[in-house]
Amino acid sequence: MSGLTSVAQAEDLWRKIQLRRCKREQERLKPPDVELRDGDFRLRGLVAGERLLEWEFIENETGVATLQLSLSHYLAKWVMNHRGRAKRNVILNVEKQGARWSGMMDHYRVVKEDSGDCYLEIVFLHDFEQTKHIRVWCNPFLRPELQFPKIWIIFGPAKWCLLVTLFVNLLRLETSLWTIPDDPTDIWEWMGPSFNPSKWRNIVKPFPFLLDNSPITMVFSRFGTFYDTAKQILENHQLTLTCRRYIKDRDPHPFDDLKGLWGIDPVEGLLQLIPLRDGCVVWDIEDNSGWGTETAFGGSWLTGFVRAVVNLAGDGQVEGVDVFTGDYTFPGEYYSPWFLGTSPRAPHVVFEEGPLTGIKSSEFSYYEATDTSFLAGGQSAPGINEGISALVNIGGDLLTSFINSQLAVLGAVGGAIDLPPLGGLMDAVLNPLYSDVFGAFMEVPTLRAMGISLPIAGLEDIVTGLGDFHYYENMVDSPMKAFTLSAFAAIAAQIHKTRARTAHTLKVSDAAPYIFAPKPYGHCWIGDRVGTSVLGYPVEHQLFVERIRKVKYRIDKDGMKPLEIEIGYREPKNPALHILEEIKRFNGAMGQAGIL
């Protein structure tokens, strides 16, 4: 090894490496620190002697924690005495290997079993639950009685748009703009003093706009929850919304890692000086997509992961993956001996199926394609009903003019009659007969019955078909105008839903050999990409790239249980469907705003 000139130096390096591994293993086996705090985040006590404690991290969803205490436990008595404490909310804070789980109590139960065993069970919801209780106002800077424009809408990189949307609504909630504060007796909650961030309960972590490499999207809402507003965007673009409580005298300032990103020393210095209150929830979004850089959808044990790009097949609907070659580039942090983690550009964590590997259980499912033809509609395409109505009106008016001209000859004997235009009358009578008859439905066939390549890793070059016996037709459920972008988008979504596809979920053990913990405590964590293999897969040595969806901890009377890790396979998204969905979302936003 370069730099080693003697056996003693090599042995010294070996001892350092073993010491580092020993410390890491001790940190992994160390029991978690569990705290109960009141509604002002003041520490009430450290939890010890619990009967059961389990908590889970779920990507972009609310995790649940359950704590069971004996009824004689002093913290159990404190929790049950909700009338005897000034701040009734109970906050659980669990710290394990750099990961911090915090959330508020949802409810508690006093349980007595048949055996006579009694205990208190407390259920907590992760702080992510707050996203379901923050509304995205049309205009967060005005009163609800006056909301102009009609819809909140912002366009740009997905991460930036979502964080700006969250920030302006947190600003509204934290600064009491034009409203009476939650606690009128607290001067710091009134307009003016409330702009002091040291009193805020939530804050968004700032970041440079120009460094946002996430895909371009549009965020809009009309008093919907931030969770509903952001959920699909986070899923589509593989972004992970994170929230972590800042604890004074224990954590570094959450903005310390922004040094060097802005390139403006005064700004970076000011960010480090922003005062934050104890227990403030810091919101951020992690980009695990690898968008705009090379990434992996699969690979092989023999060749390693391969870089790929999503494409479209000849029918414009079937997605595929093109593998391209070139010089591989790897993230710079991989060359640092102090880095511990993974990068979406080049994931290195791989789990192999076998009797002695870390995979405890796995499930790989294949779903065959179904229908070969798809229908949509119910209403005539734009312009058809209107055109027929115009022709009926014109025809009726011409008929009226002809009748009046024939009746004009009776004017000489005083019998002239001037009829009013009959076009409107005829259109009202005939409208139920011709409306939504012509061009009201559309059909889009597919090439599934003939030979096509499967958009599944390892099978892209194999041409197969459904055969002569197959399902025939499917139809979009909701009625809509035929031959519109919305109809094409709905059909594309239905085709995508009924395509041949795979699903892959696993449960793996911790430290076998990879450690599950946030950077820099573990090799991988929520949202990170990892490689997996499938038992009996037809392509030998084939690897899939999965994303970690869920991490669950459990401690009971027998001590710490093995981690439950759920990993789910995410297929490359059909780019044509994505474009049509974005157009559909844009049309919906413009319709809500009253522009379209």
Curated annotation (Swiss-Prot):
Protein name, entry field: Minor tail protein Gp28
